[in-house]
Every structure is written in C-alpha cells, then in structure tokens.
Amino acid sequence: MTRVVLASASKGRLGVLRQAGIDPQVIVSAVDEDTLLAALDPDLPPEAVVAKLATAKALSVAAELPDELLADCVVIGCDSMLFLDGTLRGKPGSAEAARAQWESMAGSAGHLLTGHALLRISGGVITHTEGDTGSTKVHFGKPAEDEITRYVDSGEPIHVAGAFTLNGLGGWFVDRIEGDPSNVIGLSLPLVHRLVRRTGLSISDLWQR
C-alpha cells in the first residue's frame, strides 16, 4: 500500500487529511524557513515563494525517510502565507506582531496562498515531483479592540500563517472567503487530488477507510 507522509507539524493540515480518509505519517522537516526566505530572489512572485518553501520541506523529509517508507510513499509538503497590501505575511511569532497584523488587516481582504509539493517515491527513488499553489481570497471582519486582545492572548494567532485560523477562534473574524476553504486551513484537497493524479495514482488508492 502506498503510504502518505505529511512533511508538516500543522494540526490543521493533519486534520484535513484525516477527515478526508488519509491518516499520514507525520515527519516534520528541518527546513529553516527564515533562512530560506532570506536567500530567495526578492522579485519572486508570492505564489512562487510559498511553492519553493513547500518543495524544500518535502525534499528535506524525503532525504530522511526510513526504508519502509522509501519503498512506496507520497510525501506532501506545504507552506502557507497571507498576501495582503502587497506584502507576504507568515507566522507573526509574537503577541505584539500578531496584534499589529490584525490591526492592519481588519476590514481588509487578502489572499491566503498555500504552496504544495508532492513527491512520489517508489523503490527508494523519487519518480515524480509535482507542485502548485492554491489561492483563496479571505475577507476579514472588524473585531473590536477587546476581541483582538483576547484572541492574541489565546495564543492561537501567534504561530499560524496570516495570524488567523479559519477553523478555530479566528473563524469568528472572517466574514467570507472566495475559493477553497481547505486551502485556508493549509492543505487544499482539490489541489492535492490533481497532484496525486499526475503521478499515476488515484486519490482513492491512498484512502484508509
């Protein structure tokens, strides 16, 4: 059976896959995102930035796979960032940065970009390298000052792309989205479906129920 490896520590991505019938092996990549971002061409389009980060994560994990997975598996790497007002925004990393981000994006709309990289590995060899970037437009509401304070104090927005989650407390402050909701959570099911088919597999080959 072809195993699925998720090259991410994201609980959101893991939840999306599990709800869709796939219980992946989770192996977190050792990629230093800040270092990689600093080395990228500053003129790269935002979609290419998240795609390169996703590919780096997938390749990093593929290089460390145990033999039982190298025999037959699919590795999925992802990276999400919010593109708003001409700027790519990743994880705030601190309460102060999360608050500043919410104060600037309240009442605005941006695009949640998720780069996807999918590696098909068979017999210890990478036979397919597929990738694409999903984009979903997110319209943010205008939370009150005390709501922003309590949201930041919850800790949720500090370590997630764009300082919000659609399927958590942050969902209260999203007015609407245009596009794929699973992409906002961090892994686009329709996009991964397309990538899997490019490798010659059917997504149903990967289901575990």
UniProtKB/Swiss-Prot annotation:
<feature type="active site" description="Proton acceptor">
    <location>
        <position position="79"/>
    </location>
</feature>
<dbReference type="GO" id="GO:0047429">
    <property type="term" value="F:nucleoside triphosphate diphosphatase activity"/>
</dbReference>
<keyword id="KW-0963">Cytoplasm</keyword>
<keyword id="KW-0546">Nucleotide metabolism</keyword>
<comment type="function">
    <text>Nucleoside triphosphate pyrophosphatase. May have a dual role in cell division arrest and in preventing the incorporation of modified nucleotides into cellular nucleic acids.</text>
</comment>
<keyword id="KW-0378">Hydrolase</keyword>
<dbReference type="GO" id="GO:0005737">
    <property type="term" value="C:cytoplasm"/>
</dbReference>
<protein>
    <recommendedName>
        <fullName>Nucleoside triphosphate pyrophosphatase</fullName>
        <ecNumber>3.6.1.9</ecNumber>
    </recommendedName>
</protein>
<comment type="similarity">
    <text>Belongs to the Maf family.</text>
</comment>
<dbReference type="GO" id="GO:0009117">
    <property type="term" value="P:nucleotide metabolic process"/>
</dbReference>
<dbReference type="InterPro" id="IPR029001">
    <property type="entry name" value="ITPase-like_fam"/>
</dbReference>
<dbReference type="InterPro" id="IPR003697">
    <property type="entry name" value="Maf-like"/>
</dbReference>
<dbReference type="Pfam" id="PF02545">
    <property type="entry name" value="Maf"/>
</dbReference>
